[in-house]
């Protein structure tokens, strides 16, 4: 047996590697919610961190570990690969170790919340993930609801790849490969939704085929917006900035832009695109690591706070000063006021977003101003304490019948 792990993580030596993973009975085991898997998957806890262990073949484990490291190094939304345990318990067998993604939620939990809008949000997030992978030359090969985890993102969702067993990385991928990947995704989504309906976890009417087919339309619309070629007159160079801003509004940065001139005609095409425009800007300004829509919301609140400061002080306020004061006077006090026993319910940035939404709703009902302190107190007492603890979603009650590897 050999254990290879990244620095900064446990050595995992106290686990019973001489026993098949399915037969483990160990105090480090914890029951965590996750998607349906063809493999045995168990979860172990070391201090404040949880790790997923997946039993597979040695070649598959090494390949998936390498792919996940490659994708993560390129800042794509995937789970963190931690290590591979070789020849455990028998030669040729292996266990892939990944870090559990805090505040991540499986599809069956989200769709079982009886909120029909969530299905659309999950599809939108899945499309963004698939487009990001294809832009980076990644053929997934098994896009499904079970192979994705979602995190809340300021009213939207963000999707993370959690299974790269069939994934291939190329310099670029052809339209044919993209189409095939979409076909697989549509088929798998249909199957996943029908399974949920059959299990009774979805109690509302849902157009399974319509939702799955909309995935293709959403994908094609986003792919076209990000990659299409535009032609316009030489005097309309302002349209270059317009195109870039439209891509930024979708949450993507244009790192390189191909511009060709033929007489009085300009042809432009984005050639290097990276998702996370607002998240990068917020990180540069504040040091906060949040998701894209959360960053968009926080940046808007910083701008509003800066405008309020300028009206209050009667003079211009530098952006850096406004940002520092926002962190100290707005974001810090609100997120820091959450009692310790509630901090595992939502990520700080998501909770902050919900407080802003709650303040708006309170002001509408009151038809007058509501302070942050008032909104926060009402939110903590009436909303947050009723939220499930989503940092590490434990298994309570029924789960999908065909889920493999859960610690019952």
Feature-to-residue mapping (PLM):
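Short, glycine/acidic-enriched loop or turn micro-motifs at the edges of active sites
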Residues: 102, 145, 166
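Activation-loop N-terminal segment of eukaryotic-like protein kinases
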Residues: 150-156
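Hydrophobic residue at the +6 position relative to the catalytic HRD Asp in the kinase catalytic loop
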Residues: 143-150
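A short beta-strand motif that forms the metal-chelation/ATP-contact edge
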Residues: 95-99, 157-163
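A short, basic N-terminal segment
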Residues: 1-17
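C-terminal catalytic region of ATP-dependent kinase domains
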Residues: 158, 164-360, 364-366
